Amino acid sequence: MRRAVSTRLAVTAALLLVSAARRAEAAQQCHPLAGSVWRNPGLMAGVRIDAAGYRNTSYLGDYQGIAPTLGFNHPKFAAMALLPAYRLARNGRTGYGLGDLALALRVPVPSFANRSLSAGFGLAATLPTGKSDADLGMGHVMLMPEFWFNHDRERVQLVGTVGFARALTSAGASHHNHGPRPIVNPMNLSEIDASLNGFLRVHAKVWLKLGAFGAAPVGNVNVQGMTRVIVGSGVLVTVRGLELSAELQAPLTGAPFTARGVLQVGYRFELKRRRRGAAPAHASHH
Protein backbone atom coordinates (compact mmCIF):
# COMPACT_ATOMS: atom_id res chain seq x y z
CA MET A 1 0.00 0.00 0.00
CA ARG A 2 1.12 3.56 -0.63
CA ARG A 3 3.15 5.30 2.02
CA ALA A 4 0.39 7.40 3.46
CA VAL A 5 -1.21 8.68 6.61
CA SER A 6 -3.78 6.32 8.11
CA THR A 7 -7.46 6.90 8.53
CA ARG A 8 -6.94 6.57 12.28
CA LEU A 9 -4.67 9.62 12.25
CA ALA A 10 -7.17 11.61 10.23
CA VAL A 11 -9.92 10.74 12.68
CA THR A 12 -7.63 11.63 15.58
CA ALA A 13 -6.94 15.12 14.31
CA ALA A 14 -10.56 15.80 13.53
CA LEU A 15 -11.72 14.63 16.95
CA LEU A 16 -9.43 16.81 19.01
CA LEU A 17 -12.25 19.33 18.98
CA VAL A 18 -14.55 16.86 20.71
CA SER A 19 -12.49 17.58 23.83
CA ALA A 20 -10.00 20.35 23.07
CA ALA A 21 -7.91 21.60 25.98
CA ARG A 22 -10.40 22.60 28.66
CA ARG A 23 -8.96 21.46 31.95
CA ALA A 24 -11.33 23.77 33.81
CA GLU A 25 -14.23 21.73 32.45
CA ALA A 26 -12.39 18.44 33.15
CA ALA A 27 -12.07 17.57 29.46
CA GLN A 28 -8.96 16.15 27.85
CA GLN A 29 -7.63 15.49 24.37
CA CYS A 30 -7.33 11.89 23.32
CA HIS A 31 -6.95 9.67 20.33
CA PRO A 32 -9.44 9.48 18.83
CA LEU A 33 -11.90 10.65 21.50
CA ALA A 34 -11.97 12.24 24.92
CA GLY A 35 -10.23 10.29 27.64
CA SER A 36 -11.48 12.00 30.78
CA VAL A 37 -14.85 13.12 29.53
CA TRP A 38 -16.80 16.16 30.69
CA ARG A 39 -18.41 16.33 34.10
CA ASN A 40 -21.67 17.16 32.35
CA PRO A 41 -22.86 15.59 29.10
CA GLY A 42 -22.10 17.73 26.07
CA LEU A 43 -22.52 17.93 22.32
CA MET A 44 -19.79 19.13 19.96
CA ALA A 45 -20.53 20.23 16.39
CA GLY A 46 -17.75 21.36 14.11
CA VAL A 47 -15.94 21.20 10.81
CA ARG A 48 -12.48 20.00 9.84
CA ILE A 49 -10.56 21.38 6.84
CA ASP A 50 -7.31 19.88 5.61
CA ALA A 51 -4.99 20.38 2.65
CA ALA A 52 -1.94 18.38 1.54
CA GLY A 53 0.44 17.83 -1.32
CA TYR A 54 1.72 14.36 -2.19
CA ARG A 55 4.02 12.48 -4.54
CA ASN A 56 4.27 8.72 -5.09
CA THR A 57 5.25 6.28 -7.82
CA SER A 58 1.91 6.63 -9.60
CA TYR A 59 0.63 10.13 -8.93
CA LEU A 60 1.66 13.70 -8.22
CA GLY A 61 -0.88 16.17 -6.90
CA ASP A 62 -2.73 17.57 -3.94
CA TYR A 63 -6.03 17.29 -2.12
CA GLN A 64 -8.28 19.41 0.07
CA GLY A 65 -10.95 18.06 2.36
CA ILE A 66 -13.83 19.36 4.45
CA ALA A 67 -15.63 17.24 7.02
CA PRO A 68 -18.52 18.03 9.34
CA THR A 69 -18.02 16.40 12.73
CA LEU A 70 -20.48 15.57 15.49
CA GLY A 71 -19.43 14.35 18.92
CA PHE A 72 -21.13 13.54 22.21
CA ASN A 73 -19.36 13.31 25.57
CA HIS A 74 -20.74 11.76 28.75
CA PRO A 75 -19.03 10.82 32.03
CA LYS A 76 -19.31 7.16 30.98
CA PHE A 77 -18.52 7.31 27.26
CA ALA A 78 -17.70 9.51 24.27
CA ALA A 79 -18.80 9.04 20.66
CA MET A 80 -18.33 10.82 17.35
CA ALA A 81 -19.02 10.73 13.61
CA LEU A 82 -17.14 12.35 10.73
CA LEU A 83 -17.90 12.36 6.98
CA PRO A 84 -15.31 14.05 4.72
CA ALA A 85 -15.66 15.37 1.18
CA TYR A 86 -12.58 15.89 -1.00
CA ARG A 87 -11.19 17.67 -4.00
CA LEU A 88 -8.42 15.42 -5.30
CA ALA A 89 -5.93 16.25 -8.07
CA ARG A 90 -4.05 13.33 -9.65
CA ASN A 91 -1.51 14.08 -12.37
CA GLY A 92 -3.39 17.22 -13.36
CA ARG A 93 -6.88 15.64 -13.34
CA THR A 94 -9.28 16.80 -10.63
CA GLY A 95 -12.09 14.83 -9.01
CA TYR A 96 -14.60 15.46 -6.23
CA GLY A 97 -16.46 13.14 -3.89
CA LEU A 98 -17.17 11.83 -0.41
CA GLY A 99 -14.60 9.97 1.65
CA ASP A 100 -15.25 7.12 4.07
CA LEU A 101 -17.57 7.69 7.03
CA ALA A 102 -15.71 7.44 10.35
CA LEU A 103 -17.36 6.42 13.63
CA ALA A 104 -15.75 6.07 17.05
CA LEU A 105 -16.63 5.16 20.63
CA ARG A 106 -14.49 5.49 23.75
CA VAL A 107 -15.17 4.26 27.29
CA PRO A 108 -13.07 5.18 30.36
CA VAL A 109 -12.34 2.45 32.92
CA PRO A 110 -12.85 3.82 36.48
CA SER A 111 -10.37 1.37 38.03
CA PHE A 112 -7.60 2.81 35.83
CA ALA A 113 -8.22 6.39 37.00
CA ASN A 114 -6.82 8.59 39.74
CA ARG A 115 -6.53 12.36 40.25
CA SER A 116 -4.20 12.88 37.28
CA LEU A 117 -4.66 9.76 35.15
CA SER A 118 -7.54 8.40 33.11
CA ALA A 119 -7.49 5.44 30.74
CA GLY A 120 -9.78 3.07 28.91
CA PHE A 121 -10.63 1.38 25.65
CA GLY A 122 -12.03 2.58 22.34
CA LEU A 123 -13.26 1.30 19.02
CA ALA A 124 -13.29 3.22 15.74
CA ALA A 125 -14.51 2.12 12.32
CA THR A 126 -14.69 3.45 8.79
CA LEU A 127 -17.50 2.56 6.40
CA PRO A 128 -16.95 2.52 2.60
CA THR A 129 -18.93 5.60 1.58
CA GLY A 130 -16.07 6.86 -0.61
CA LYS A 131 -15.37 5.49 -4.09
CA SER A 132 -12.29 3.30 -4.03
CA ASP A 133 -11.75 3.54 -7.80
CA ALA A 134 -11.53 7.34 -7.42
CA ASP A 135 -8.95 7.06 -4.58
CA LEU A 136 -11.44 8.54 -2.11
CA GLY A 137 -12.32 5.43 -0.10
CA MET A 138 -10.96 2.04 0.93
CA GLY A 139 -13.79 0.01 -0.53
CA HIS A 140 -14.22 -2.01 2.68
CA VAL A 141 -14.92 -1.68 6.41
CA MET A 142 -11.96 -1.03 8.72
CA LEU A 143 -12.10 -1.74 12.48
CA MET A 144 -9.67 -0.04 14.90
CA PRO A 145 -9.73 -1.05 18.60
CA GLU A 146 -7.36 0.76 20.96
CA PHE A 147 -6.19 1.36 24.51
CA TRP A 148 -5.74 5.01 25.52
CA PHE A 149 -4.48 6.98 28.49
CA ASN A 150 -4.44 10.63 29.55
CA HIS A 151 -2.08 12.11 32.15
CA ASP A 152 -2.85 15.62 33.39
CA ARG A 153 -0.34 17.68 35.37
CA GLU A 154 -1.62 21.24 35.73
CA ARG A 155 -0.27 23.03 32.61
CA VAL A 156 0.86 19.84 30.85
CA GLN A 157 -1.20 17.00 29.42
CA LEU A 158 0.09 13.77 27.86
CA VAL A 159 -2.21 11.65 25.71
CA GLY A 160 -1.18 8.25 24.37
CA THR A 161 -2.71 5.33 22.49
CA VAL A 162 -1.83 1.83 21.35
CA GLY A 163 -4.11 0.30 18.74
CA PHE A 164 -4.70 -2.32 16.09
CA ALA A 165 -6.46 -1.95 12.75
CA ARG A 166 -7.86 -4.67 10.50
CA ALA A 167 -9.75 -4.51 7.23
CA LEU A 168 -12.82 -6.72 6.94
CA THR A 169 -11.69 -8.04 3.57
CA SER A 170 -8.98 -10.19 2.04
CA ALA A 171 -5.97 -8.96 0.07
CA GLY A 172 -7.37 -10.39 -3.15
CA ALA A 173 -10.70 -8.62 -2.73
CA SER A 174 -9.23 -5.21 -1.86
CA HIS A 175 -7.54 -2.42 -3.79
CA HIS A 176 -4.52 -2.38 -1.47
CA ASN A 177 -2.42 -4.55 -3.78
CA HIS A 178 -2.69 -2.10 -6.69
CA GLY A 179 -0.66 0.78 -5.30
CA PRO A 180 -1.93 3.95 -3.60
CA ARG A 181 -5.55 3.25 -2.62
CA PRO A 182 -6.97 5.55 -1.50
CA ILE A 183 -4.75 8.60 -1.79
CA VAL A 184 -6.53 10.69 0.85
CA ASN A 185 -6.28 8.36 3.88
CA PRO A 186 -4.97 4.84 3.21
CA MET A 187 -4.00 2.18 5.74
CA ASN A 188 -2.41 -1.24 5.71
CA LEU A 189 -4.93 -4.07 5.63
CA SER A 190 -3.63 -5.07 9.07
CA GLU A 191 -1.45 -2.88 11.29
CA ILE A 192 -0.51 -1.87 14.80
CA ASP A 193 -0.19 1.79 15.70
CA ALA A 194 0.70 4.11 18.55
CA SER A 195 0.51 7.83 19.23
CA LEU A 196 1.76 10.27 21.84
CA ASN A 197 0.66 13.89 22.08
CA GLY A 198 1.75 16.56 24.54
CA PHE A 199 -0.17 19.76 25.33
CA LEU A 200 1.28 22.79 27.11
CA ARG A 201 -0.97 25.55 28.41
CA VAL A 202 0.63 28.93 27.69
CA HIS A 203 -2.50 30.98 28.44
CA ALA A 204 -5.87 30.40 30.07
CA LYS A 205 -7.33 29.96 26.60
CA VAL A 206 -4.32 28.78 24.57
CA TRP A 207 -2.54 25.41 24.39
CA LEU A 208 0.43 24.34 22.27
CA LYS A 209 0.55 20.81 20.89
CA LEU A 210 3.39 18.50 19.82
CA GLY A 211 2.70 14.92 18.80
CA ALA A 212 3.74 11.85 16.86
CA PHE A 213 1.93 8.91 15.27
CA GLY A 214 3.39 5.65 13.94
CA ALA A 215 1.98 2.52 12.33
CA ALA A 216 3.50 -0.72 11.03
CA PRO A 217 1.98 -3.60 9.02
CA VAL A 218 1.45 -6.94 10.77
CA GLY A 219 0.40 -10.36 9.50
CA ASN A 220 0.64 -11.86 6.04
CA VAL A 221 -2.51 -10.22 4.66
CA ASN A 222 -0.57 -7.14 3.53
CA VAL A 223 0.64 -7.46 -0.06
CA GLN A 224 2.59 -4.20 0.08
CA GLY A 225 2.69 -3.09 3.69
CA MET A 226 4.39 0.14 4.70
CA THR A 227 5.62 1.59 7.99
CA ARG A 228 4.99 5.29 8.50
CA VAL A 229 5.79 7.86 11.18
CA ILE A 230 4.25 11.33 11.25
CA VAL A 231 4.92 14.28 13.54
CA GLY A 232 2.83 17.39 14.03
CA SER A 233 2.67 20.63 15.97
CA GLY A 234 -0.12 23.11 16.44
CA VAL A 235 -2.13 25.39 18.67
CA LEU A 236 -5.53 25.10 20.39
CA VAL A 237 -7.62 28.12 21.35
CA THR A 238 -10.84 27.99 23.39
CA VAL A 239 -13.21 30.92 23.96
CA ARG A 240 -16.24 29.84 25.96
CA GLY A 241 -17.90 27.16 23.83
CA LEU A 242 -15.97 28.03 20.66
CA GLU A 243 -12.85 25.99 19.94
CA LEU A 244 -10.22 26.44 17.23
CA SER A 245 -7.38 24.09 16.35
CA ALA A 246 -4.62 24.48 13.73
CA GLU A 247 -1.87 21.94 13.06
CA LEU A 248 0.95 21.29 10.59
CA GLN A 249 1.98 17.67 9.95
CA ALA A 250 5.06 16.21 8.26
CA PRO A 251 6.26 12.63 7.64
CA LEU A 252 9.48 11.22 9.07
CA THR A 253 9.19 7.96 7.13
CA GLY A 254 6.63 6.42 4.80
CA ALA A 255 6.18 9.68 2.82
CA PRO A 256 2.38 9.95 3.23
CA PHE A 257 2.47 13.55 1.94
CA THR A 258 4.96 16.35 1.51
CA ALA A 259 3.15 18.42 4.16
CA ARG A 260 -0.38 18.71 5.48
CA GLY A 261 -2.26 21.47 7.28
CA VAL A 262 -5.35 20.82 9.40
CA LEU A 263 -7.80 23.46 10.65
CA GLN A 264 -10.72 22.60 12.92
CA VAL A 265 -13.50 24.78 14.30
CA GLY A 266 -16.17 23.58 16.68
CA TYR A 267 -18.71 24.69 19.23
CA ARG A 268 -19.45 22.82 22.45
CA PHE A 269 -22.95 22.71 23.91
CA GLU A 270 -22.84 21.52 27.52
CA LEU A 271 -25.99 19.74 28.64
CA LYS A 272 -26.83 20.08 32.30
CA ARG A 273 -27.65 16.84 34.04
CA ARG A 274 -31.11 16.74 35.61
CA ARG A 275 -31.11 16.49 39.39
CA ARG A 276 -32.48 13.30 40.86
CA GLY A 277 -36.06 13.69 41.92
CA ALA A 278 -36.58 16.83 39.87
CA ALA A 279 -39.88 17.08 38.04
CA PRO A 280 -39.85 17.06 34.23
CA ALA A 281 -39.73 20.48 32.61
CA HIS A 282 -43.28 20.18 31.31
CA ALA A 283 -44.74 19.28 34.74
CA SER A 284 -45.32 22.91 35.71
CA HIS A 285 -47.70 23.32 32.78
CA HIS A 286 -50.22 20.83 34.19
Where are these regions (language model features)?
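C-terminal segment of classical bacterial N-terminal signal peptides
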Residues: L17-A24
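Transmembrane beta-barrel domains of Gram-negative outer membranes and organellar outer membranes
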Residues: A26-H286
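Bacterial N-terminal signal peptides that target proteins for export
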Residues: M1-V11
